[in-house]
């Protein structure tokens, strides 16, 4: 049985350099947990709405972050406009994360696809107390056979033993 949605709207977010964007939301009437989702590189947040709707039907409030230069972002990459990971990790993601506060103190997961998953890992590492879970889809990890010995042989063990 799917849950009725209480909110299918958007939250406006922005940072001091003038960049603003829309955080798309799908919030069920009685959410049990929430997810801040980071898209793959070059993919607008709106393409994840079917995922957000499916998760919301299962009781999860979903918030879709928008990358600089994509979708609702007021910026576009050009020779006159440049940004890097510092902008994403220290400005944009904290602003999107802060917009979730109005939905209460639900257990929060962060996740993403591809580059979004890698940046989600970095953001979670910078704010370890903020997230209960990390969701990754096709986010790439270092393949153990690419490393020289002895690290090559220690990595599979580390992958199995780390939480």
Describe the predicted segments one by one.
Residues 45-47, 52-78:
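Conserved alpha/beta-hydrolase
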Residues 27-34:
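Proline/glycine-enriched tight loop/beta-turn segments at coil->beta junctions
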Residues 115-163:
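Alpha/beta-hydrolase-fold enzymes
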